[in-house]
Amino acid sequence: MNISEAIKAVISKQNLNESEMHDVMNSIMTGQTTDAQIGAFLVGLSMKGETIEEITASAKVMRALATSVELSSNDYLVDTCGTGGDGLGLFNISTASAFVVAAAGGKVAKHGNRSISSKSGSADVLEAAGINLNISPELISQCIEEIGLGFMFAPAHHSAMKHAIGPRKELAVRTIFNVLGPLTNPAKAPNQIMGVYDKSLVEPIANVLKGLNSRHVMVVHSEDGLDEFSIANTTYVAELKDNNISTYTVHPRDFGLEEGNLDSIKAENAEQSLALINEAFSGKKGVARDIIALNAGAAIYVSGLVNSFDEGITKANQILSDGSAQDKLDAYTLASNS
């Protein structure tokens, strides 16, 4: 199917099958379409509503075209990458969580970008910490193997995305590309905590990840709009484990955590975000530490290091008390600049 046919189909509210969507997305990502065609297709697809099959096919195309990071094993390999777009301006929770997971013995293939909707994206806060983002896939692989964490800067691994950047910026509305980033980890991490910007995406995205052969995943969105586990409210979860998907809700009280005020962990820029992370990593008690423990605990659980979410949070709290997450941040900063 070519893009002209696809535009007509989506405008008529017709879903594309996996093969059709593969053809269209491949033509977009290999520069065979015009900006006007890309814009028309993305808006038509968004208005129709993207299906699980369409998102899965698109993710497969992006994965195939990505500059990959090769690892000797994917045991305990996890990503903590969300869609962003919650608009609440909190510090970089999933980025902080990654260092806690590494300190717990996990392998974190952290996929991320600069800020799109927040005041500070994962790349922005890592850069503020002195980390070099522009390192080779080989060095990223070495860091994951030796330190337990590597950061994959999305533009460096998804160069095919350049064909869609112009139309996406000009449209300035959410499209399928808002969910594709976290679905296209260049190290093929089989385990994942993926936050999404809307509750309606939680279960469908878990089904997409099932179709992409993920091992253990939690897709989350909180009652207060976070694409993370919230420390202040209920979080909706779709968990993929043993090829089955279960949906449920969790609340910080379920794990003996106090409800926290999200206003206290807002960050106006990358420097403020880093300051909150450094405080939590130094052992300071408070909302920042608790929300990191909650989210890192989930990632430790899906990585396979522990058998329950509860155990993951306990492990995360131990790490935040002993300073080893800061050690991982320091080690990665040094290695990335070597």
PLM-predicted stretches and their roles:
Residues M1, V10-I55, A64-S72, I291:
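N-terminal glycine-rich anion-binding loops that anchor highly charged ligand groups
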Residues I3-S4, M21, I38, I55, ...:
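A general structural signal for well-ordered alpha-helical segments in protein cores
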Residues A9, A64-T67, L90, G105, ...:
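Glycine-rich anion-binding loops and their surrounding alpha/beta cores
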Residues N17, T34-D35, T51, S94, ...:
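Helix N-cap / loop-to-helix initiation motif
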Residues A40, A96-V100, I291, N295-A298:
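Short amphipathic alpha-helical face segments that pack within enzyme cores
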Residues G49-G112, I116:
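Active-site cofactor/substrate anionic-group-binding motifs, chiefly glycine-
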Residues R114-I131:
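Active-site-proximal loop->helix
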